[in-house]
Amino acid sequence: MELSLVVFTVVCWVSVWSDDRIISDRHAVYWNSSNSRFWQGEYTVAVSINDYLDVYCPYYESPQPHSRMERYILFMVNHDGYLTCEHRMRGFKRWECNRPQSPDGPLRFSEKFQLFTPFSLGFEFRPGHEYYYISSPHPNHAGKPCLKLKVYVKPTSSGYESPEPFLTDQSQRCGADGPCLAVLMLLLVFLLAGV
């Protein structure tokens, strides 16, 4: 009986362990002109499916003149819009950094890189593709530099990418060659042997 309990515990642990690979990463981007990663014009972040991009807007704790506080409108654009820093080229407004002295701290916007979204305002991303974000200074702050970001969604290990990952994503299940199958087989042997 005790051995069966140990085997059951191990199987449960392996099941949880295999799901650890699903945990997503968070990538922080501080969207302001003092961020040196924007200075070269090639700020790129590589993400995986189910990762998050957290964009932090400019924030000022101490009082500043209104004209010195940065405010931006962020757009998702196509490649041409990224190269020219022009949001009118098949781009759409994604977020607005318009509260640089928010009492709750800096505004943060999050993008989840997923194959399918249930939300009407969500966006679906594909592995192996690049996505582009640019900012246009707030209308009251024309002449500020254009900040732009390229996000590369890394390819997954499976060859086929379905819009419904729960149907085809092998990394989320026990495979025939994984440790999960070996533990389940061991459990079956113990149960059949009557241990």
Swiss-Prot record:
GO cellular component: plasma membrane; side of membrane
Cysteine disulfide links: C57-C97, C85-C146
GO biological process: axon guidance; ephrin receptor signaling pathway; osteoclast differentiation
GO molecular function: ephrin receptor binding
UniProt note on tissues of expression: Widespread expression in the embryo.
Alphabetized SUPFAM superfamilies for the sequence: Cupredoxins
Record lipid sites (GPI-anchor amidated cysteine): C174
Signal sequence segment: 1-16
Ephrin RBD domain sequence ranges: 24-157
Propeptide: 175-195
Record membrane topology: Lipid-anchor; GPI-anchor
Superkingdom: Eukaryota
Main location: membrane
Subcellular location: Cell membrane
Pfam family, one: Ephrin
Annotated glycosylation sites: N32
Keywords: Cell membrane, Developmental protein, Differentiation, Disulfide bond, Glycoprotein, GPI-anchor, Lipoprotein, Membrane, Neurogenesis, Signal
Coiled coil regions in record: none
Self-association state and partner proteins as the record states: Binds to the receptor tyrosine kinases epha2, epha3, epha4 and epha5. Interacts with epha8; activates epha8.
Function summary: Cell surface GPI-bound ligand for Eph receptors, a family of receptor tyrosine kinases which are crucial for migration, repulsion and adhesion during neuronal, vascular and epithelial development. Binds promiscuously Eph receptors residing on adjacent cells, leading to contact-dependent bidirectional signaling into neighboring cells. The signaling pathway downstream of the receptor is referred to as forward signaling while the signaling pathway downstream of the ephrin ligand is referred to as reverse signaling.
Family the UniProt entry places it in: Belongs to the ephrin family.
PANTHER family reported for this sequence: EPHRIN, EPHRIN-A2
Protein's UniProt name: Ephrin-A2
UniProt organism field: Danio rerio (Zebrafish)
Gene (name only): efna2
